[in-house]
């Protein structure tokens, strides 16, 4: 099946066996953005959203998302995460919010899925908390920006084509 590791020779989905892989420090950084109306951005920036501290709640949700990734992605290994750091960057020019998540573990498989899930859950929480005033918000540009560790080595998005 041409390099797709989640399928066996017969084409059936399976969880990849990582038992023989060496344990190493694994780090992944993912990023995403939510665009919104200027008035919605002002509510978040000024801490005046009716549901409370939007970014504070979204930060906790993102951490929870990283921890629950294996429950959501069927073939993803459950991992003992050693660190999840969530940062939000307010962007007046957009207007919107960028979410950057760094996830770390010491194990046999990477944490890219945990970082991506954390970004999505954090941004979905922003949407949920602000949808009463702005149903047109758009979550966009969610991607892995960097990964470190493991057999395949280090990688940065700027190293990729496209």
UniProtKB/Swiss-Prot annotation:
The keyword Lyase applies. Substrate binds at residues 75-77, 113-114. It is an enzyme of class 4 (lyase). Keywords: Lyase, Molybdenum cofactor biosynthesis. Pathway: Cofactor biosynthesis; molybdopterin biosynthesis. The active site is at residue 128. It catalyses: (8S)-3',8-cyclo-7,8-dihydroguanosine 5'-triphosphate = cyclic pyranopterin phosphate + diphosphate. InterPro entries: MoaC, MoaC_bact/euk, MoaC_sf, MoCo_biosynth_MoaA/MoaC, Mopterin_CF_biosynth-C_dom. GO terms for molecular function: cyclic pyranopterin monophosphate synthase activity. One of its GO terms (biological process) is Mo-molybdopterin cofactor biosynthetic process. Its EC number is 4.6.1.17. Catalyzes the conversion of (8S)-3',8-cyclo-7,8-dihydroguanosine 5'-triphosphate to cyclic pyranopterin monophosphate (cPMP). Belongs to the MoaC family. HAMAP family: MoaC_B. NCBIfam families: moaC (TIGR00581), PRK09364.1 (NF006870). Homohexamer; trimer of dimers. This is Cyclic pyranopterin monophosphate synthase.
């Amino acid at each position: 099946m041409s390099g797709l590791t989640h399928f066996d020779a017969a084409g059936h989905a399976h969880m990849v066996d990582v038992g023989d892989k060496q344990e190493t420090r694994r780090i992944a950084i993912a990023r995403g953005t939510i665009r919104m109306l200027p008035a919605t951005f002002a509510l978040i920036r000024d801490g005046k959203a009716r549901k409370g501290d939007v970014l504070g709640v979204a930060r906790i949700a993102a951490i929870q998302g990283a921890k629950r990734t294996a429950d959501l992605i069927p073939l993803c290994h459950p991992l003992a995460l050693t660190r999840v750091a969530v940062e939000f960057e307010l962007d007046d020019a957009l207007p919107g919010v960028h979410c950057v998540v760094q996830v770390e573990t010491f194990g046999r498989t990477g944490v890219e899925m945990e970082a991506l899930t954390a970004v999505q859950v954090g941004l979905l929480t922003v949407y949920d908390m602000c949808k009463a005033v702005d149903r047109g918000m758009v979550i966009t540009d969610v991607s892995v920006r960097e990964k470190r560790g493991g057999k395949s080595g280090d990688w940065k998005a700027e190293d990729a084509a496209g």
